[in-house]
Amino acid sequence: MEVKKSSYNNREVATQKKGRRFVMILKFFLLGNPLSLCMKIINSVVIVGLYYGFMTTFSIGPSYLFLLRAWLMEEGTEKQISATTGFIMGQLIIFISIYYAPLHLALGKPHTMTVLVLPYLLFNFFWNNNKNFLDYRSTTRNSIRNFNIQCIFLNNFIFQLFNHFILPSSTLARLVNIYMFRCNNKMLFVTSTFIGWLIGHIFFIKCVGLVLFWIRQNHSIQSNKYLLSELRNSLARIFSILLFITCVYYLGRMPLPIITKKLKETSETEESEENEEESDIEITSEPKEQDEEEGSTEENLYFGYEEKEDLYKINETNKIPVNGKEKTKDEFHFKETYYKDSPVYEDSYLDRYQEQELWELESKEDKNLFWFEKPLVTFLFDCKRWNRPFRYIKNDRFENAVRNEMSQYFFYTCPSDGKQRISFTYPPSLSTFSEMIERKISLYTTEKLSHEDNYWVYTNEQKKHTLSNELINRIKTLEKKTGSLVLDVLEKRIRLCNDENEKECLPKMYDPFLNGPYRGKITKLDSRSIRDDLITSTDAEESIEIVWINKIHGLLPIPNDSPKKEFEYQKNLFDGEFLSTNSGHSSTSIGEVPLEYPPSLNLKKLSLLAEEKRMDSEKQAKCLQLIFDVVTTDYNDQTIRNQNNKLIFPGIEEIRKEVPRWSYKLTDDLEEQEEENEEESMEDHEIRSRKAKRVVIYTDKEETTNAISNTSDSDQAEEVALIRYSQQSDFRRDLIKGSMRAQRRKTVIWEMFQANVHSPLFLDQIDKTFFLSFDISEMMNLVFRGWVGRESEFKISDSEEEETKEREKNKEKKEENERITISETWDSIIFAQAIRGSMLVTQSILRKYIVLPSLIIAKNVGRMLLFQFPEWYEDLKDWNREMHVKCTYNGVQLSETEFPKDWLTDGIQIKILFPFRLKPWRKSKVRPHHRDTMKKKGKKNNFCFLTVWGREAELPFGSPRKQPSFFQPIWKELNNKIRKLEKTFSLSLVLRVSKKTRKWFLKISKEKTRWVNKIVLVIKRIMKELEKINPIFLFGFGKVKVYESNENRKDSIISNKTTDESTIRIRSTNWTKHSLIEKKVKDLADRTTTIRNQIEQITKDKKKIVVTPGISISPNKTNCADKNSELQKPIWQIFKRKSTRLIRKFYYFLKYFIERIYSDILLCTINSLRTNAQLFLESTKKMINKFFYHDETNQEGIDQTNQNTIHFISTMQKSLSNISNKNSNISCDLSSLSQAYVFYTLSQVQVNNKYYLRSVFQYHGTHLFLKDRIKDYCGTRGLFDYKPKHKKVDKSGINEWKNWLKSHYQYNLSQTQWSRLVPQKWRNRVNQRCTIQKKDSIILDSYKKNQLIHYVKQNDYGIDSWTGQKEKLKKNYKYDLLAHKYMNYEDGGDSYIYASPLQVNRDPKIPYNFNTQKTQKPESFYALVGIDISDYLGEESSLYGEKNLDRKYFDCRILRFCFRKNIDIDIWTNMHIGTKINKNTKAGTQNYQKWDNKDIYPLTIHQKTKPSTSNKRKKLFDWMGMNKERLYRPISNLESWFFPEFGLLYDAYKLKPWIIPIQFLLLNIHRNTNLSPNNNINGNQKKDLNLRSNKKEYLELENQNQQEKKQKLSQRDLGSDTQQDTQKQKKKEDGEKNYTESTIKKRRKKKQFKSKKEAELDFFLKKYFLFQLRWDDSLNQRMINNIKVYCLLLRLINLKEIAISSIQRGEMRLDVMLIQKDLSLTELIKRGIFIIEPVRLSIKWDEEFFIYQTLGISLVNKSKQQSETDRRYIQKYLDENPFDKSISRHSTMLVSEDKNYYDLFVPENILSTRRRRELRILICFNSWKGNVVDVDRNFIFFNENDIRNCGQFLKKDKHFNTDPNKNKLMKLKLFLWPNYRLEDLACMNRYWFDTNNGSRFSMSRIQMYPQFRIY
């Protein structure tokens, strides 16, 4: 019993424990963590599926129509149940298709659904509308076999299956597909989604049933049986209409396949040519016989997810059926080759040829079986149609438009980092290929390892160690002095050999073991003349050695941005005889070598700088013969012969990724009109451009003589036409005909006639929207009026004037809109223009020949009846002067007799010049002031436009103006006579009163004059005192601008000399209060000036009145006393009111005066004491630092150095010259601001404004460049993301490439574009630089610091800046500019990447770029341009045989300008431009401003000085043209980003363009070059624009002395003897002058040849520069007015009168006329009207540029010596002289002809290219474990000592450190490592991330270049 009891007790205890445990678990779930429980439930697949399924219930589609129709109409539950069942079954099939791929593909096939849906809809429509079509009546049979029930089921079932391409579903239904990517258990998710959808639809059906039940039970509805029966009878018709409308709406989103417009595709010949020109694959086709027999060509098809689309129009004959699908051969990655005779191809491709016959038979069978299928499918569903309404991005070059609708995303699993991951950029062809292989061969039969990830990492580690050990062993082998051959150390390249005995290998381009440059590299020469010289020459020494282009060539994108007509490829005819006789040339002498070397040639692999081995003559002949055999078989029937009987054929470009393109080129209306006279005119335009009409205004019928071919085209007249655009909004929006407009972004308009339609998305960016038509600033003024004070007191008197102007402007705008409305109404109605034109012509004839002669006769007859002389002669003369000029619809004058072209359809205007005015008499007796007003009216209104009703209007379609009445002068004259008679009676009374009034007035006026003079004297004295105290009062806080006389201004200038720049106080902390005080002071100062001017004017007027009291001013002899008494009253009232206001505001004036005295005197004293103390402390600190730390750079010392160590005399002089120049705007020298001032001011901005400074405060690089004190101050206040300070910051090697990549993103706008965004005040702002602050540093005259007196010109951003987003954007831009100039540079110097101010330590360091020697003057500087403008002007490889290598354009890669000691660049450019030189510009040059030739300055123009002239005073360069006397500024972004010396040359070029040869401007090689006369570039070719027509380019190429001078200057520098006599030089110049004149006429056909220079200039201007006139509204109107007058003047014989009258009335403006023959564009450029901007290009740099560029950045050289490496590098540059006959681009390649013996200093070169890349990638994978630095790593957070690079292998070897030359060479080779790394990055970016353009290359924010230490 006890045992049982105990067991019972134990069981009870266990039960209690379980219960307690369950309660604890329940408590944990319910109380402890309810949130996680809820999240788990919500995130479960079932709940999410139910939610998405329920949401799809609300996706109401057309399928609901059938369901509702069945429930409403059909009687009987069977039909309702069948409808519901079909509805649910269809949806179930849709959900299952999400999971089951074959079903999804079957439902998504566009062809099948197109064929099925359209007949079904047609059948259903007829069935519902025709009762006799089928028996629709209900039957008594209750069976499922009832046909009606089956049809109802099918209707609901099929409508659910309609795919989205025919009837797109709503967005909610697609949420299911979106979640599929997140969910793992897809089947459970699909099931729960369907259940959710079922629940929702059951709920919906129940709701519908309740509504129907309510309708049936409603007594009011049931009582009206007639209404119910009618509703029931019409329900079928209603649902049919609804269904039809729905289908039409959905089908409208994709156009009907039958109706849509077929676009004209390019022909096969064009396509094949273009494919060969741009092809990214190399096509080797059959010989001609096989091609004719079988007609097979390679296809290039893209298989998308939903449809197959041809990228190019190629014959679809060679399909390969694989598993029921048509696959092309190209998808198998095979190459078809038919060289069956060659032993190379027989064995390797034997299997291919055996299968070829089967493929051809099957393709023929396919063609016979399905001959009807292709046309039908293509007809119904054209894959090439432009269905989506994409914008057609025009490509003016030779390529087709890129298809951007095809997604590059393709999801597939691939191993990544050892794991199987989904890749969204997997190549589709590769996945298809792998699936095909898997079906046939089970490749993946190996078992998966359990630890796959670890295995992968371990494998990579092993590979890395193996490669590293192999590399180290090879290096150790080299170290052994056992005589081991270097070739044994080098890794051999593996080749695919065909026969071991014969040692014949595959060609390199077909060898799968070779990659990189050998797989697709083609070397081209651009100049036909060079190639001809090479081929015809027999001297082997004159042949050119061409070095392989680096791999970077193939990786960086090459823009094809030359016009199509410039591409003509030429090939010389070769025969075997020629090749056998000329044996001294290398194989790469011919430019169009499209293939690699043949297999029999054993060529050594070339390294980066090694020269190419020459082949012997036999092998060379074989190579060339093979090449040209291949070429001729490619193009047997497509070769085109030019005049020289040379074959023109396209070369094959380098391999790059193929981009899907459209198979046609589209043109718009304008292009069609431009090309209508040319050979290749399009039939019809396909792009719906803006509605426009081409109005011919002038036809040039003169004989145009062609200067080139000396043939005259007298019969071909050139038309000058204007394009008249419709004033309506452009709803066409460049849509392509046949595309779906409904899918374009919706646009709305809210005005009657709106110029541009906008999407509602951009309403907030528009100034005044339709619902917010008031100005926000007015509202802000009302809100903040309490802060400002009573604004009425400070109201400026000009406000009324401004309001009046605003009212007039609004009135004019309203009238203009009314005119536009009338104009568009006439233009839109059919036949309205013909009716209106006929009425106008009729009214013109009636007016001229009937109405006006009748009025003249009537008037003169009346005069004769009134016994007055008739005025026949005067009236008939005026009548004859009236001209009725026929104008175009928008008012361009033609002539009196010539009607516009197509005037009955396009419209006409009739303009009346000198309209006739019928006057009662000629010599009017009107009073003089009336006569003046009439004169003004006559000047303004001596023309009008005729209206339809015969009236006159000021403007076309304007309101008729009021005609001067004929009888009004008569009534006026009668009234005057009557008034005279009345005045004679009251004359005596008037005289008596006037005497008394005169006495009283004289007495009062004397007293007032005395009092006013005293006030004026007091005010003047106060102003002078203020000016003596502080001249900044002239400008106030940046707003007050008191206009002084010249004397006062001179006084202020003199007193300004004593002002120190440190007297500018920091603004007060209260931003708002301070801005309000400024506003008050500004208003007060304006009021003071206005009052003073008014008082002076009153005094002058009163003096006049007092001095001449007795003069009568009335023609009626009225006494002056009446007038004086009337004038006295308003003058006295005005003066009293103004003086009272002055007295009232005197308190504020006094308060401001005291405040200024306090701020200027006290703060000046305090600041000066503080500055002096600080300077003393800093100098002491410097001396201590110099004594103790002589060899180290002191970071803190640099940062804390105040920038007040500039020579005050030169600073004052610069500021004086700026102030004294009245024409200059006050510049904002932002570079003068200190960091403390900038960030203290920014910190005082209110909190609501700090949001817009986030880009400044949260810039991740900010803390690196700030001083510690400022950093701590701003960090504690939360301005920055405060981070711990890094004590040791890497100096000038920090992230240059990273920052450079960041700064050059796509929105890097030019200065011109910024100037269009910011106000006018900022357009002329000059970004001035600071000087290098050293006692022996260079002080440039134009870089001296201006005082902050110019900073006060900035806009006020107080309250007024809170008025809208645009103002905030401008403000943000300015703050960014401030922050940019102070953050994006480093303390070591001025990086050329950022044009930032310099701070140089006491130890003279090289600021990144250049190395010079202290002891001797360097030979030259090699300036590198790696900045923004180089993206626009860089040299691009020319592919065109017609262009020459001596093409003259700016090559920004090599900018080396070597001047003699006394050549001033400013004087030189002015000498070339022809502008005057202001001699006072250089007045500020003092003796203490000396050049330090030992020091380095960041500007790279170097003066070559003679030793004997070292003590002479040297001229200072005006680098950027900062002197205010030169008013023009660079329009593009040169002043802030470019090298200053090149900027000035560029400005000079823009003012008076000349063409500088590349040899002289950019490549001053230091040797004597004697150019042959044939290749001498003759002259400075200058541009002369003749604006006679808008098409004609009238470019004269004249020889000018300037170019000869330029050449000679350069040749002086080229000569070894720099002290040549100038007289000899002049004689030499005169002897070498060679004048050539040629003229370019209008554009000719494609095949017409131009002369060499004309073609070069034309090509240069078109390709590299963008010429445009800034057509703002004012200039546009003036130019159009001038054109209108020109059109009339061209047709007149005697045009003097019309021209003078047009100028007098302001209709023709002289300022926009081309008056002088030799046009200097200074004025147009200065005003910003004419703009020359470089075309944005992607540059294909050469490898030497990249190498030197990288070296300039990566190497941190701590000495001032120029390394041996640099000298040798430049010497190689100078020694290279491959030929002298022409100037080749290859002369700029820095490749030595000597053997390269130091290739192995980079140990990686021992390995092959593939192994090298593999090693790098493995190192990057495992970089966290080793010492090698990763490419992504930021070096700031690591210790400097841990930084290692590939030099770590060589540090241990003492042999390398013994020879200093070799050590330097090693350093040079070490920096080649980043070059390879950049190449790898480009490869990874392009092929791993699937980008097909190079613009995204800058998006990869990877620091590619680590810092390289110099030990």
From Swiss-Prot:
- Please report a single Pfam family linked to this protein: Ycf1
Q: Where is this region: Disordered?
A: 265-299, 798-817, 1599-1647
Among the record's GO biological process terms, what is one?
Answer: protein transport
Keyword Ribonucleoprotein included in the entry's annotation: no
Q: Which cysteines are joined by disulfide bonds?
A: none
Signal peptide as annotated in the record:
none
> What GO cellular component is one of the record's annotations?
chloroplast inner membrane
Chief place where the protein resides: plastid
Mode of membrane association: Multi-pass membrane protein
Q: Where is the composition biased (Acidic residues)?
A: 268-297
- Any idea where this protein resides? Plastid, Chloroplast inner membrane
Residue ranges, compositional bias (Basic and acidic residues): 1603-1615, 1623-1635
Tell me the keywords, alphabetical order.
Chloroplast, Membrane, Plastid, Plastid inner membrane, Protein transport, Transmembrane, Transmembrane helix, Transport
Segments traversing the membrane: 41-61, 81-103, 108-128, 147-167, 195-215, 238-258
Q: What does this protein do?
A: Involved in protein precursor import into chloroplasts. May be part of an intermediate translocation complex acting as a protein-conducting channel at the inner envelope.
Question: Subunit comment for this entry?
Answer: Part of the Tic complex.
What family does the Swiss-Prot or TrEMBL record give for this protein? Belongs to the TIC214 family.
Q: Could you tell me what this protein is called?
A: Protein TIC 214
Write down the species. Answer: Lemna minor
Instruction: Recall the taxonomic lineage recorded for the source organism.
Output: Eukaryota, Viridiplantae, Streptophyta, Embryophyta, Tracheophyta
